[in-house]
Amino acid sequence: MDVSRVTACSFPLKEKDLDYTFQVISASGFEKIDLVGRMPHFSVTDPEYDLDELRRVIDKYGVALANIGSYCGRGFSDGSKSGRQAALDEMKQTLDVAKEFGAKSIRIFPGDGTRASMGEVVPYFKESAEYAEKVGVYMGIENHGGEISGNPEACKEISEKVGSRYFGILYEPCNLMAAGAEYKSAFETFKDHIVHVHVKDGRANAEGKWERCMLGDGEIDYQWVWQQVEASGYDRDYALEFEVGNIEPVETGYKKWLNTWANM
């Protein structure tokens, strides 16, 4: 499959500095990065974070910023108005940096993740989406295991309530399966709201528990994912997310994943 639209998530290198992280991802054959939104990789709130260092490693290794895997939106459930405003400011600042560096999207979180809080967080996401449209950067809730992010119907509901094409879902088939949601039916539920895609693989073990594995060794049919997502009109990136350091070091594993994707 097309490798020109593949990126590498920096999450498996989250404890490493930016220079080492970009070195590994570049050496693995990637030209774009999905940068996790925590120190030392990224922050708009930590005064020690240096955007000039990010510029330096991008230029040094020729790896472009494709997506920021931020944690923006969590503060929309804060108990104080000032806390929610601070979260909104963080969201807008992150969108500004994404635009400045040419990233197409950012990952976001649906407040505290509970369905009961949806009505409280939607107004903040509406304002965020208006700003996102102005700067041309998409925002996506990543499928995790929460009441919203791990529930396809809730993902669709919050997307419809916000009502912006710049707000939607970061489709993550493997995370959905881990949460007990079948990834193909989930796609059908929220396919009109997909703004980004994460790629990793997994399978049920002998006890029926979902476990991650090397890309191509699991149950996720990524040819199906590619065909369906492309048919929906999606034209952005697919981020490989290597989270199997217990099987192989990321330093050698990412190159294998890129080759696996290319040969699918």
Regions found by a protein language model. Give the residues of each.
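Conserved beta-strand positions in the central sheet of alpha/beta enzyme cores
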Residues: 34, 67-69, 107, 140, ...
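A short acidic, helix-capping loop that chelates divalent metal ions and anchors anionic groups
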Residues: 39-43, 74-79, 112-116, 178-180, ...
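Active-site acidic/histidine proton-transfer and metal-coordination neighborhood
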Residues: 17-20, 57-64, 76-169, 178, ...
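Active-site-proximal loop/turn and secondary-structure-junction residues that shape catalytic pockets
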Residues: 12-14, 37-39, 71-74, 107-114, ...
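Flexible, glycine- and charge-enriched loops at secondary-structure boundaries
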Residues: 44-51, 80, 84, 88, ...
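N-terminal small/glycine-rich loop or linker at the start of catalytic domains
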Residues: 1-7, 66-78, 107
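Histidine-acidic metal/acid-base catalytic patches
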Residues: 1-7, 14-31, 55, 59, ...
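Glycine-rich, proline-tolerant flexible connector loops at the mouths of alpha/beta enzymes
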Residues: 34-59, 110-116
